């Protein structure tokens, strides 16, 4: 993993919800994330380290309440960890660069992958490919 800022530095940089999600493996309430309904063309990055994670053309409305994607930008973008918390068996997804918690991946997504990367808006930043505008979840 790349050098990650200290917890103190991150607490200054991130909102309380962003810190909770990315550093404490938290989950934002469904249907509340700023990037859930974003339909612009561009790239979704890790909020903590700016690593590109997902292209907008892989985003879709799964109805689950969090931004959903069917494929990351590269194999290196995402780290996968078996998660047995809360009495469930899931696969946690983290940033492949800084290890920030992003969400979980499920095998119920659309083709071509059949996967649903269910990602907290609070873990993402978005860069608009047309005008360079930045949005943070």
From Swiss-Prot:
Record has Metal-binding as a keyword: yes
Catalytic activity of the protein: L-methionyl-[protein] + [thioredoxin]-disulfide + H2O = L-methionyl-(R)-S-oxide-[protein] + [thioredoxin]-dithiol
Cofactor-binding details, from the entry: Binds 1 zinc ion per subunit. The zinc ion is important for the structural integrity of the protein.
Disulfide bridge partners, by residue number: none
GO BP term (any one): protein repair
Stated name of the protein: Peptide methionine sulfoxide reductase MsrB
Primary gene name: msrB
Entry keyword annotation includes Metal-binding: yes
Domain annotation MsrB: ranges: 7-129
Cofactor(s) demanded: Zn(2+)
EC number: 1.8.4.12
Active site per the UniProt annotation: 118 (nucleophile)
Database matches in InterPro entries: Met_Sox_Rdtase_MsrB (IPR028427), Met_Sox_Rdtase_MsrB_dom (IPR002579), Mss4-like_sf (IPR011057)
Transmembrane segments: none
PROSITE patterns in the record: MSRB
Pfam (any one): SelR
Keywords: Metal-binding, Oxidoreductase, Zinc
């Amino acid at each position: 993993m790349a050098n990650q800022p200290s917890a103190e530095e991150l607490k200054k940089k991130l909102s309380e919800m962003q810190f909770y999600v990315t550093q404490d493996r938290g989950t934002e309430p469904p249907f509340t994330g700023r990037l859930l309904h974003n339909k612009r063309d561009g790239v979704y990055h890790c909020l903590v380290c700016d690593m590109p994670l997902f292209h907008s053309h892989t985003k879709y409305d799964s109805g689950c309440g969090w931004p959903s994607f069917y494929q990351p930008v590269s194999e290196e973008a995402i780290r996968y960890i078996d998660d047995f918390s809360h009495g469930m068996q899931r696969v946690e997804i983290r940033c492949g660069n800084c290890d920030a918690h992003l969400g979980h991946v499920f095998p119920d997504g659309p083709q071509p992958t059949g996967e649903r990367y269910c990602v907290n808006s609070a873990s993402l930043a978005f860069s608009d490919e047309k005008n360079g505008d930045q949005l943070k979840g």
